[in-house]
Each structure stands twice: as structure tokens, then as C-alpha cells.
Amino acid sequence: MIRRICLDHFRRVENKCIELSRFSLLYGPPNAGKTTFMEGAALLIQSRGEQWLAFEGPLLIIHEPEDVHFGGDLERPFAVELSVEVEGELITYGYRYATASNYVEQWVGKDGKLLARMAKRGERGALLYPVEADLCVAPYAVMNEDALITCGAVEDERLRVAERALLTLRVGLKDKFYLLSGRRLAAWKYTYETHVDLMPATSVGPEGQFTAHHLSRILTQAAYERTRELLYAYLPLAGVEDVRVGLVKSGRIAMYVKSGGLWTNAYNAGNYTKAVLPVLLQLLLANPGSAVFVDDADLAVPATHAERLLGAFLEIARARGLQLVLAAKEPAFATAAERLGLEVVSL
């Protein structure tokens, strides 16, 4: 479970941390930083185990470094820090980077105590804590023990503990984080063609782009019988009576929904259905114990539907042992969240 996210000069957040519980709502006006916190966490998590920050990955795509540097200043480093509860331990991991100089700095801690800090020094790297030592390479590797390889032997148990903490965090976050962005309406403008071997096993994609593909599996495969039952139980919440998936002439998968007794292509469905259905499906598919982050949870949702919708999301999350973190700007969502027992984080 993700307990804390800290950002320093990342996108529009100058320096701020937020504390999260199992069920949280990030609430604030437009441009308050709700998306920034979610995407900061996503950037680190999609980069886990990589040799560099993965600006383009399965959770989000960042085309230019200027997009994440505060004020577009490539000289000033940005930093993202996560505190994650894994196997009964609270592991903190931070990554600082400046595009102009390629400066990098990392740190890892456990249960509130710093275990190791390393940074780029010259063309190589240096271990700054718990002792000073030269690193064989600059510590660019993300959430990876490779960033702690020293050129000589270092006899300090804290370094071994730091290596184990990085391994625990990297493995513990595998297939345990899902992000649904506010761009999920765009995916419904066209059908997707993808090889099933390349499709995420349990993710509908950050833009809901694999919604139809997963529905095809759920509706046709016996292994998804329980998921199918739950889907139909919650389907009216998305404003539709039934759903079908089929192939169009190009060989691509297309989705059809039934509403008011009539069938139509999902492209013709209202924005409410387009916004809500991928979220419901993601909650039903997510691996137990995962964190599901939903940006713009109030997207195309009338204020009168807020409590009913949040209540259903919460019900599924509780039943499946998920962490649920939502973001919304509508006051009705904050009011409903408080009534339902979600922690409201005001930005």
C-alpha cells in the first residue's frame, strides 16, 4: 500500500507531500496538483528495475523532459519520493534528477530511518551514506540494487539492508499498481488492434484502451465466471443494461452496449458510460492487494451520482483488498467521500 507521495519541483508541485490511507480522495480545484501526484508515483513505479527513468511506459507517456521540470527549468532537479508498505515494512524510496546536467541522486530508507544515499559525482557515482565510497557507475538504475554497486568492499550492514529493501520494493510493486487517467474518454474514439500476448493481463490501460479486449475474455472464458457475475451486477452503475464485444471488418475488436433496449457501438455511448465502465472493470480485474489510482473520478459524473458511484467503487475495493485512491474537483465527491469514510486529502 502506498502511504506517502512527496514531490519536489515536479511538474506544477514545488514542494509537497501527501499522506494516503487505504481509501483516499485527493480533492481540490483544477490545477491543484492531483494528477501530478498520481503521475509522479506512476513514473517511479513504471521505471522500477530499469536502468533509467522510463518516461514512456505502460502507465504514462512523457514526451519531453520539460513537461515534468517545474517551470520548465531543466537545470533544477525534480524529485519524487514514495513510502510503500510492503510485507509489513514501510520502505521509502526517492529519486532526484536534472535533465540538463544528467545529475542523479537516490535514497532508500526503512521504517523512517535512512539506509543509503547515492549520487552522481563526475562521470561515476558516489555512496554518500551510510559511509562514503565510490560507485562503479552513476546511480541511474531505478529501484534497483545495481545503483549500490561499490568499486571496493564496504563492510556496513546498512548497505546490505538497503539492497534487500530495494529488492523487496521492486518485487512488491510488480503488477500491484494501476492508474486510470482522465484521458480515458479518448480511447473510445477508435477500436484497438493489439496482440493478446502484448496486452496487460489485468490492466485496462491508463486510458481504458484495453477495456473491450478484457471484456471479450470475461464474456467468453469460463475462468472469468465469477468476474462476469460481478460485472453484470455493477453494469447498471455505468448506465448500460448489457455489453457485447465483436470483430469489425478490419479485424479489430469493437464494443457494443445496450441502453434503453437498444444496442449501439460504444463510440456512441455517453461520456458517463465511457468514463465509468473502465474504472469498474479495472477494480474487478486488479490483482488482490493492489493500489488502484483513478484520476478525475468525477469525469462526466453528475453530482447526484457521486455517493452511489463512490459507494460501489469502495465496495469492490474492500471486497478485493485493494487500495483505492481517487481524485476529484467536484464538492459533491468530497462530501460523499467523507460520508462513506474515505480520507479526503485537500490540495
Model regions and ranges:
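Switch/communication elements of ASCE P-loop NTPase nucleotide-binding domains
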Residues: 1-71, 85, 242-347
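Phosphate-coordinating catalytic segments in nucleotide- and nucleic-acid-processing enzymes
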Residues: 48-276, 287
